[in-house]
Amino acid sequence: MRCGSREVFVKIQEATNPEWGKPPSRRSAEEHIKYSLVLLDKPRGPSSHEVAAWVKKILGVERAGHAGTLDPKVSGVLPIAVAEGTKVLLALSRSDKVYVAVAKFHGDVDEGKLRAVLGEFQGIIYQRPPLRSAVKRQLRTRQVYSIELLELDGRYAVIKMHVEAGTYARKLIHDIGEVLGVGANMRELRRVAVSCYTEEETVTLQDVADAYYIWRKYGDDTYLRRVLLPIEEIARHLPKIWVRDSAVDALCNGAPLAAPGVAKFEAPFSRGELVAYFTLKGELIGVGRALVDSEEVKKMEKGLVARTDRVVMKRGTYPPLWKRRGEGAKA
């Protein structure tokens, strides 16, 4: 999880034509809804799919999709992309997560021993998905970036864990109990962060409903814009590449990003890493997979920089200059 600032490297100083596209802040309320992200605080009870369906119904859109499923009994951060924004949910598909769990041990445990055992689970661990899992039950490795004891009260413990996507917190608690020799089960779980998105930023379903009602009833979209983030926020954690106006439409048509289309970019990033394409006005075009690392991009004058995987911007938002100039289907 890279949530800190990156260095921006400018390859070419270029202005953007104000006649094409628009900064996200200048979108109409309807456009804002169509290209938005909701950082929802999912309550315990409903499934993630049910919650996403409620958001879709409240906002009157055809599609809404969530990233990182939470079981019905689990609460916390659930990113939901709305309408066109669902096209770039890939940006969050492999994001790391932070959970706070309440564990109950089946016997008395010493705090010092518990802390020592938790330390053994930091790093690469092996996990087999639970019996009720939707995925094939094959043994696999997952990274536990950190795990700490927040509180111990009798046989109950509050444990905070920062883990790789796809890690089963319930199984982790079970395995900790096995190593301690007393057994354990998870009594409660809350997700407090997804990548750079924390529970302090979340909103409730009631917030979404109220914001939409106020806009429809009174024409005031101030609250709506606070509750629904612009879809650009879905790429907050990704390295960004800003492209020249002449390259935008090619990317919208699924073309790979070539070096001449790059105006500036954030470093560092590695070959194979997911990157986000932006216009010079700050609009999210889509996401792709880097074909070279950022150090190579600094020196490149030709060749491919990234493969385009998902596109959110509508074709024709910027004119197809790449066709007029006979550059072929490369941005």
From Swiss-Prot:
The active site is at residue 71. It comes from the Archaea. It is an enzyme of class 5 (isomerase). Keywords: Isomerase, tRNA processing. SMART domains: DKCLD, PUA. It catalyses: uridine(55) in tRNA = pseudouridine(55) in tRNA. NCBIfam families: CBF5 (TIGR00425), PRK04270.1 (NF003280), unchar_dom_2 (TIGR00451). Could be responsible for synthesis of pseudouridine from uracil-55 in the psi GC loop of transfer RNAs. This is Probable tRNA pseudouridine synthase B. It comes from Pyrobaculum neutrophilum (strain DSM 2338 / JCM 9278 / NBRC 100436 / V24Sta) (Thermoproteus neutrophilus). The lineage of its organism: Archaea, Thermoproteota, Thermoprotei, Thermoproteales, Thermoproteaceae. The gene is truB.
